């Protein structure tokens, strides 16, 4: 097994939707060097790998961000940070608009308004949501991608995470990655509690 040492400003562990979106946001707002490590391939990884038929987090006309917070709090039986949910909820529609600009097909009615489904959902043709995000990430100026690299542990010095260790699944390589910051985007925590 060969050893490869890498250095980056920001390491993102996980190349699903959240990891890709984080990389895009960082790339568009800074010149920081970003490295995504994904155990599969960012084109079809994460919980949206196969696509979806709706965006289930959108503030539809007549609703406000607090409504989404209330829904999520009830759904999680109160185990939430309301302040974080509110901050996220205030940006949901902005993220949706951005995904549409990247090429995601969002269904619209005859007046050009998004077709909604319920109180917080939009109908989409989302089978290509991950390939669309992957393409945008691949074109980002300061983002490098390591597909098929499984991160196995954090690199820690003096109680501070300063990188990670990974194994190339297909290339027999052990990666030692130094990073000034690490974002863990390895998946949601859904299903940790009893459904209500």
Where would I find each of the regions flagged by the language model?
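Short, solvent-exposed loop/turn segments at secondary-structure boundaries
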Residues: 194-196
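Core beta-strand elements of the Rossmann-like FAD/NAD(P) dinucleotide-binding domain
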Residues: 5-8, 171-181
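Short, well-ordered coil/turn residues at beta-beta hairpins
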Residues: 14, 179, 185-186
């Amino acid at each position: 097994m060969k050893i490869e040492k890498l250095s980056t400003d920001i390491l993102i562990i996980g190349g699903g939707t959240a990891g890709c979106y984080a990389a895009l946001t960082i790339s568009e707002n800074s010149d920081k060097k970003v490295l995504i490590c994904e155990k599969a391939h960012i084109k079809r990884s994460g919980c949206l790998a196969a696509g979806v038929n709706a965006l289930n987090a959108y503030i539809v006309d007549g609703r406000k961000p607090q409504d989404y917070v209330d829904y999520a709090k009830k759904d999680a039986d109160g185990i939430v940070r309301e302040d974080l949910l509110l901050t996220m909820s205030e940006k949901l529609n902005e993220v949706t608009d951005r995904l549409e600009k990247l090429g995601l097909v969002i269904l619209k009615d005859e007046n050009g308004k998004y077709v909604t489904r319920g109180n917080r959902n939009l109908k989409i043709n989302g089978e290509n949501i991950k390939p669309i995000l992957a393409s945008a990430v691949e074109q980002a100026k300061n983002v490098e991608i390591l597909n098929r690299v499984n991160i196995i542990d954090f690199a820690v010095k003096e109680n501070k995470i300063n990188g990670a260790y990974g194994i190339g699944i297909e290339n027999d390589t052990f990666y030692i990655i130094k990073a000034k910051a690490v974002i863990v985007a390895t998946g949601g925590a859904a299903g940790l509690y009893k459904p209500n």
